[in-house]
Amino acid sequence: MNWLDTVRWDDKGLVPVIAQEAASGDVLMFAWMNREALQKTAELGQAVYFSRSRGRLWHKGEESGHLQTVHEIRLDCDSDVVLLKVTQLGHEPGIACHTGRHSCFFSLYKDGQWVATEPVLKDPASIYK
């Protein structure tokens, strides 16, 4: 059996993916992969996702330069979620979020509202031209 056949793909042929920074353990982002994206990620050693809005593969950092070097690819106990342990490249600290922040999980629920807890490290307008 091919290693990709072990993954429990959803009815659209996708699997959810969490990118975690290998050094710090920070959760950077959530995305989706199809079979081709997961295979390319394993081959290249860089994160390649499937963009549902664009309907195509998305090599993380292709526009921004904020690539993700993949150190480990893990599959959860139900074989339906992938975890990538990555090094976020392109800025120090790494910028994983399109808002110019380190992590996409910068909003904290506190006292009945969402509060931004991470600074914008780089203006998105200067990242995506």
From Swiss-Prot:
GO terms for cellular component: cytoplasm. It is an enzyme of class 3 (hydrolase). Mg(2+) binds at D76, D78, D80. One of its GO terms (biological process) is L-histidine biosynthetic process. Zn(2+) binds at C77, C97, C104. It catalyses: 1-(5-phospho-beta-D-ribosyl)-5'-AMP + H2O = 1-(5-phospho-beta-D-ribosyl)-5-[(5-phospho-beta-D-ribosylamino)methylideneamino]imidazole-4-carboxamide. Belongs to the PRA-CH family. Homodimer. Catalyzes the hydrolysis of the adenine ring of phosphoribosyl-AMP. This is Phosphoribosyl-AMP cyclohydrolase.
